[in-house]
Swiss-Prot record:
Protein family per UniProt: Belongs to the bacterial ribosomal protein bL21 family.
InterPro entries associated with the record: bL21-like, bL21-like_sf, Ribosomal_bL21
Name of the protein described by the UniProt record: Large ribosomal subunit protein bL21
Function as written in the Swiss-Prot or TrEMBL entry: This protein binds to 23S rRNA in the presence of protein L20.
Provenance organism: Lactococcus lactis subsp. cremoris (strain MG1363)
GO MF entries: rRNA binding; structural constituent of ribosome
Matching SUPFAM superfamilies: L21p-like
Lineage: Bacteria, Bacillati, Bacillota, Bacilli, Lactobacillales
Superkingdom of origin: Bacteria
Gene Ontology biological-process annotations: translation
Quaternary assembly: Part of the 50S ribosomal subunit. Contacts protein L20.
Gene Ontology terms: cellular component: cytoplasm; ribonucleoprotein complex; ribosome
Keywords: Ribonucleoprotein, Ribosomal protein, RNA-binding, rRNA-binding
């Protein structure tokens, strides 16, 4: 059984294991560089470690593959009988990360 971990990044919790690909909120790291996640909440596998609130000494190392934007989300608001409407679009930026190792 391979090691897996639950990390905190971008205000969200993500389950990761070696070789997995995750999409997280945009990180200020160039594509091709490595990124280390220090906020590890849980480590599982042959042994289990639960953080209170974080697991001491545990890190997750990944490599940034690319940056991009998600599909556009369109919001449309209108007021009936008032000839008033508003259309707004939003594309959330993300970072694609390939997990290289889970160190507990």
């Amino acid at each position: 059984m391979s090691n897996y971990a639950i990390i905190k990044t971008g205000g969200k919790q993500v389950k990761v294991e070696e070789g997995s690909v995750i999409y997280v909120e945009k990180l200020n790291v160039e594509a091709g560089q490595t990124v280390t996640f220090d906020e590890v909440i849980f480590v599982g596998g042959e042994t289990t470690k639960v953080g209170a609130p974080l697991v001491e000494g545990a890190t997750v190392v990944g490599e940034v593959e690319k940056h991009g934007k998600q599909k556009k989300v369109v919001t449309f608001q209108y007021k009936p009988k008032k000839h008033s409407h508003r259309k707004q679009g939003h594309r959330q930026p993300y970072t694609k990360v390939v997990i290289k190792s889970v160190n507990a």
